[in-house]
């Protein structure tokens, strides 16, 4: 029997009605009240997520920048202390090792935040390519992460923070902020398509912080949220999920995150030749939005057809809680990727009519 890993908040889930599932070897809450209710709370008020299963790796040393420039696709040299950057790590063939966030805490001090299912693989990949005076340390077990997301997130978090949160702009952070007396790194980032913050603290402080935030946010409608709503929210915002929109067989260009690939940076990073070619001349496949016109919900790996030709497959799909439509993301042959192209999705051995639509499906009004 496989023992599932648990976050420092596991013992608190039951108090709030959390229903747990096995998520990539982690016992995590899929929902507390209902996915629809939690999704709605984040779009209209605020939601609190336990994201402590995510991995954290510290990269330090004189050669830390040179090392990161070699292993990630974005240009880390443009990052200033107090800034965050979204990027990817790729194999030499351009396939994706992982997508991640890099926080620059000091001139020779970076924190990498990686996907939970990839912690060991990513750490080994990084450690095996270290150059010069750079150190790579996996600190995942020492760090917990909470995400407070939604239009009311700032107001709620402000109640327990003395610094003015308005000063933390999008993709910026402050280190060593006291959140209700607990030292934390607070960044204006998220995975929902809404405004919000991700809070990194010591594992032993996570439960106290979780309870305090839910207490001070209750009157504004802050709800504890699970993986179900996290997935429907990120999907509507067209934010990729590793293992679905990204994988060792899918490049960042194909997945629509070409903005995080800088082939013109000086460093010869892994996958550079392939990604440069795809960025300049186009990739053979493209991630597109699809709306199902007939009955049926597109799910991961469902094949997409035009006539008898299979042109790709669905990577993610659901009945969108915000749009009340059956929509999906699909990786398809680029020659059929134009908006309004009519396609068919095979749902339970039956072909269902669908159409290519623009993405993101949802974009918050500023």
From Swiss-Prot:
A molecular function annotated in GO for this UniProt entry is:
transaminase activity
Q: What is its EC number?
A: 2.1.2.10
Catalysed conversion reaction: N(6)-[(R)-S(8)-aminomethyldihydrolipoyl]-L-lysyl-[protein] + (6S)-5,6,7,8-tetrahydrofolate = N(6)-[(R)-dihydrolipoyl]-L-lysyl-[protein] + (6R)-5,10-methylene-5,6,7,8-tetrahydrofolate + NH4(+)
Q: Which GO terms describe its cellular component?
A: cytosol; glycine cleavage complex
What is this enzyme's class at the first EC digit? Answer: transferase
Keywords for the protein's UniProt record, in alphabetical order: Aminotransferase, Transferase
Single GO biological process annotation from the record: glycine decarboxylation via glycine cleavage system
Query: Into which family does the record put it?
Result: Belongs to the GcvT family.
Q: What is the purpose of this protein?
A: The glycine cleavage system catalyzes the degradation of glycine.
Subunit relationships: The glycine cleavage system is composed of four proteins: P, T, L and H.
PANTHER family assigned to the protein according to its UniProt record, in alphabetical order: AMINOMETHYLTRANSFERASE (PTHR43757), AMINOMETHYLTRANSFERASE, MITOCHONDRIAL (PTHR43757:SF2)
Name of the featured protein: Aminomethyltransferase
> Which species does the entry assign this protein to?
Bacillus cereus (strain ZK / E33L)
Give the encoding gene's name. gcvT
């Amino acid at each position: 029997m496989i023992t599932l890993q648990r976050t420092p908040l596991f013992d608190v889930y039951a108090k709030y009605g959390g229903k747990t599932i096995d998520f990539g070897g982690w016992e995590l809450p899929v929902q507390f009240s209902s996915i629809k209710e939690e999704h709605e709370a984040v779009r209209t008020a605020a939601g609190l997520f336990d994201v402590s299963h995510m991995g954290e790796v510290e990269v330090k040393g004189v050669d830390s920048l040179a090392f990161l420039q070699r292993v990630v696709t974005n240009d880390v040299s443009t990052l200033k202390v107090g800034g965050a950057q979204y990027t990817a790590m790729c194999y030499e063939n351009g396939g994706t090792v992982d997508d991640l966030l890099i926080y620059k805490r000091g001139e020779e001090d970076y924190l990498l935040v990686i996907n939970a299912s990839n912690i060991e693989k990513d750490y080994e990949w990084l450690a095996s390519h270290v150059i010069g005076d750079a150190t790579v340390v996996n600190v995942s077990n020492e760090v917990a992460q909470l995400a407070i997301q939604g239009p009311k997130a700032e107001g709620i978090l402000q109640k327990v923070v003395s610094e003015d949160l308005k000063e933390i702009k999008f993709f910026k952070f402050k280190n060593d902020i006291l959140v209700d007396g607990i030292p934390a790194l607070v960044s204006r980032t998220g995975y929902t398509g809404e405004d919000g913050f991700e809070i990194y603290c010591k594992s032993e402080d996570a439960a106290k912080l979780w309870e305090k935030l839910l207490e001070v946010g209750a009157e504004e409608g802050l709800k504890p949220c699970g993986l179900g709503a996290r997935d429907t929210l990120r999907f509507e915002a067209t934010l990729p999920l590793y293992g679905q929109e990204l994988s060792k067989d899918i490049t960042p260009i194909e997945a629509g995150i070409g903005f995080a690939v800088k082939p013109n940076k000086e460093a010869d990073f892994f996958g550079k030749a392939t990604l440069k070619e795809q960025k300049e001349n186009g990739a053979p496949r493209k991630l597109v939005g699809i709306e199902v016109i007939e009955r049926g919900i597109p799910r991961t790996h469902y094949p997409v057809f035009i006539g008898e030709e299979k042109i790709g497959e669905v990577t993610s799909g659901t009945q969108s809680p915000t749009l009340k439509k059956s929509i999906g993301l699909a990786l398809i042959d680029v020659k059929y990727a134009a908006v309004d192209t009519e396609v068919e999705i095979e749902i339970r051995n039956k072909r269902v009519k669908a159409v290519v639509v623009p993405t993101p499906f949802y974009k918050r009004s500023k």
